[in-house]
Amino acid sequence: MPYIKEIIKYLEGGNNPFYYYIFTFFSAITLRNFVEFMIVSNAHAIQWHHPVHFSLFYISLCLSIIILLYLITREKVERIARVVAASFIITPIVPAIDLLLQVVWDYEIKYQYMIPEKTESILKNYLLFFGNHAGATPGIRFEIFIAMICCSFYVFYKTSSLLKSLLGAILFYSLVFWGYFAILFSIQGIERLAGLLYDTSPKTMIDTYLFLAIHAFLLVLYFYNRAYMTAVVRDIRLTRILHYEMMVIFGFALGYPDSGRFFMSLSNIMEIYFVVLSVVFAFIFSAITNNIADVTIDKISNPDRPSVTGVIPWETYNIIGFTALFFSIVYSLTAGHMILFLIICFIGVYFLYSMPPLRMKRIPFFSKGFIALNSLIMLLAGYSFHGKEITSFPPTVAVFVLICFTACSNLIDIKDYEGDKAAGIKTLPVILGLKQSKMIIGIFFAVGYASFPYIMKMPDLYAPSIIFGIALLLAINIQPYKDKIVFSLYLLSSISLLGYLIAKNINK
């Protein structure tokens, strides 16, 4: 027992940089994949998606184990992560043991466990994992057994509780079995309940593990530092993200009527979810870079932002931003190369708008064309989700979006009037004065809403559109100005009009 404590202390110690443990983890699982590919009987069938699929499996599993051990021990997440990441060095043992036994017993190695079509009873497999039944190879069983013992020792070392130690081993095994070994049963069950096609293709498996990995990762980050996560979430500018997400859904609805494609499998659902997720991450990156450039202005207009309060150190704040950028690119790529291209365009346009050296937001009025362009890009992202070419997007709608949102996006400068004025940024409110600019921007909204039914060729929307436009005109000019009320009314009106459009298109 003492030597186990020494191993844990060594792995938890801060003498080695954390990225050493990350590289150790990836080196271990890469070695596992390499050895497995070399010895399996159907190695000739290995394709590009196999290492991707398997690596994502291990990444999501590693994160899930960290969460489990944190909930049981309440140890610091970073310490747990160091131990768990290094512990994956046992994974290459599996193919090594199976290869040795193959030489002795001459049996065929096949890593095909818990296949729905070949599994008699999932509960029996769970209860008799170490028993005499077809499924996991001896190497896998040995690996799980060793991992359960290690988990039990770690929990006991941290809690000094035999009960928690036993519970930790059982919960670890249950997590691995029900959360990962039985994943095909979960996919099959969800697809049956939703009336979707049964699909366990490599794309579905990759999407599934990406889904598990990102949510586990975010939960690990939350447990690591709640203050950082809370600060980022509070500064997420929810109303603006919702605007862009609605543009994606609007584009999806525009592309639906003559595409004939809808959600046919679980993978289709996850693809559109990943588009939504990539937009969120792209906006987080853009918001963080904008905050870094706007510290002087935000000290006056937005003193509660993390860049002003200092709740997150600058170095960490930058890391969070580029991590969000990384996830935005990864998850947009899963939805297709066109989505990836459009997300990169979205990020680039926002960078040109808010960041030096160009910092185009300093150009009065017309700089909002960058925001309008990003709105159009999100429309195209939803539209192209159906596999349609963006060149077939209705040109009248594209022109309407560019003109209307260029004019209406000046709304965001009302709240920042004092900060922009102090910083010498010539926005419409700074040039014309707050009262006059609010009236002009309100008129932009009223005209835009009144024009929407004409552009969309939906005359039955004239009455509600005009009502919403007038309501926004009044809300913008109410004293004192309430940013949340205006954006809430905008989102409510947009959701209502969008809901009508979707319902009409689906019923065609």
List the predicted regions and their residue ranges.
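Multi-pass alpha-helical membrane architecture of UbiA-family
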Residues: M1-K508
